Curated annotation (Swiss-Prot):
Catalyzes the reductive methylation of 2'-deoxyuridine-5'-monophosphate (dUMP) to 2'-deoxythymidine-5'-monophosphate (dTMP) while utilizing 5,10-methylenetetrahydrofolate (mTHF) as the methyl donor and reductant in the reaction, yielding dihydrofolate (DHF) as a by-product. This enzymatic reaction provides an intracellular de novo source of dTMP, an essential precursor for DNA biosynthesis. The lineage of its organism: Bacteria, Pseudomonadati, Pseudomonadota, Gammaproteobacteria, Candidatus Pseudothioglobaceae. Its EC number is 2.1.1.45. The active site is at C146 (nucleophile). This is Thymidylate synthase. CDD domains: TS_Pyrimidine_HMase. It comes from Ruthia magnifica subsp. Calyptogena magnifica. Homodimer.
Length: 264
């Protein structure tokens, strides 16, 4: 995806050297946006391999409302291991906030069900929003939400989604996050009998970790290939009933995996 490589190059060439919580150090750029027309193909980068089982299983896990890594580990997904406690728990992260946000009266709000109802019944609403940034529970989360806030938009029979990501690990995290929310947009569109429109990714602190510099150079030397196509082979009664096997990524051609260490 040229948009992503242009972004990666811009951060590398114009970013500011900054310290960070992990102690590794970053080259950082504040504020950037990319737009992907989902009808042109699925926005899965081709200049390195993305581990699709991790993308799909993590999204299904979020949608289930779970915050224990047991399901992920059972399906060979280890991306949350470093943050979990000895029992595998992560505190009230994405799954809880998406499906079980507690209001001041102690009532549970299922934000995913709420936005589905809005898309179906009030598609012109400017309030079709899911937030994972629950200020009152941040201190209890293993990691505060990086992809914190997303909004849906309906026009001309198409569903679009915009994500705001407050903290963006441009080399490791962003390709994964783009794929995850593009997949969610496809699922929501199918459930609401709409076509897919655009996915817009908006980043706050967009950074390349100092220990990813060589990997970035390798990736920038590669040439993007034609995007894959997503085929959803089943339409369950609920967005919560999809299975991993329901998703087929057709003609995903990619360059070799580039190993890099995640900052903890």
């Amino acid at each position: 995806m040229k948009q992503y490589l242009d972004f990666l190059r811009l951060v590398k060439n114009t970013g500011t050297n900054k310290t960070d919580r992990t102690g590794i150090g970053t080259t950082s750029l504040f504020g950037y946006q990319m737009r992907f027309d989902l009808s042109d193909g699925f926005p899965l980068i081709t200049t390195k391999r993305v581990h699709l089982p991790s993308v799909v299983h993590e999204l299904l896990w979020f949608l289930s409302g779970a915050t224990n890594i047991k399901y992920l580990q059972e399906n060979g997904v280890r991306i949350w291991n470093e943050w979990a406690d000895k029992n595998g728990d992560l505190g009230p992260i994405y799954g809880v906030q998406w499906r079980n946000w507690q209001n001041v009266r102690g009532e549970s709000i299922d934000q995913i069900m709420q936005v589905i109802e809005q898309i179906k019944n009030t598609p012109d609403s400017r309030r079709i929003i899911v937030s994972a940034w629950n200020v009152g529970e941040l201190e209890n989360m293993a990691l505060p939400p990086c992809h914190a806030f997303f909004q849906f938009y309906v026009a001309l029979g198409k569903l679009s989604c915009q994500l705001y990501q407050r903290s963006a690990d441009v080399f490791l995290g962003v390709p994964f996050n783009i794929a995850s929310y593009a997949l969610l947009t496809h699922m929501m569109a199918q459930q609401c009998d709409l076509e897919v429109g655009d996915f817009i990714w908006s980043g706050g602190d967009c950074h390349i970790y100092s220990n990813h510099t060589k990997q970035v150079e390798i990736q920038l030397a590669r040439t993007p290939k034609t995007l894959a196509t997503l085929k959803i082979n089943n339409k369950p009664d609920s967005i919560f009933d999809y299975n991993f096997e329901d998703f087929e990524f057709i003609n995903y051609v990619f360059d070799a995996y580039i190993k890099a260490t995640v900052a903890i």
